Amino acid sequence: MKKIIFALCLLGTITSCCKQPTMIGHRGSLLGVENTEEAFINGAKHFGYQGLECDVKTTLDGQCVCWHDNNLQRGGHENSIIAETTLDSLQSLTLTQTRKDVTYTATICTVDRYLEICKEYKVFPVVELKWATGINNNDMSLFPSLYALIEKHGLVEEAVILTSMRQSLEYIRTNYPQLQCQYLRQTVKDEDVQWCHDWKANISIQHANINPDLVNTCNELGVEVAAWTVNNDSTYQRLVDCGCAFVTTDYLEIK
């Protein structure tokens, strides 16, 4: 009997050590055209994710919109280049995308509206910076306008800036130290982890390249690990066991 009680206590200790990660909706969620209002609202309202991730591009007239690519091919408009098109013209287009056999339509979502949704549903924004005019390793001249939007919605303390552009993160950490930062990586080298420690950033890694030793190394340096993009339960549980702090997903239910 004593052995059974001890085993149960040990199991409880192990379980309590595996803290459930914070869940982030990838480009909002599966339910809707990615990176649009419907997907963001469903990520917060339907799935209950604590954070919503978006990708940022800039328009011809310097406005920040939520989209992953340089063009709108994913939404059915291959010839529409975001950097060469005004916001008004982009918003006149109907985006269409089929996901899991369901076809959705939408219009492009501004970062302003995305942040409004985050505020309304009490979730934190994860703003991924893609290479764009005025927001890239060589030129961050449009970042102040993006920061102004974050400030406008009272989300400075909650917002996470995510990007693979190291120089951009160094600019943000130097000029906007109040913002949280994550360094986006496919695979990770020791120097990446050390850089995150030195620049007070966390790290976001493709899930297949995460293991317990890597997470422990990061945590020992005060660096939290986020995993992307996780869409099955077995992978999710493996990452929980590894000790990941954040998991980005399209449609996993919160455990």
Please tell me what each predicted stretch does.
Residues C17-K255:
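Phosphate-group recognition and catalysis centered on beta-loop-alpha active-site segments
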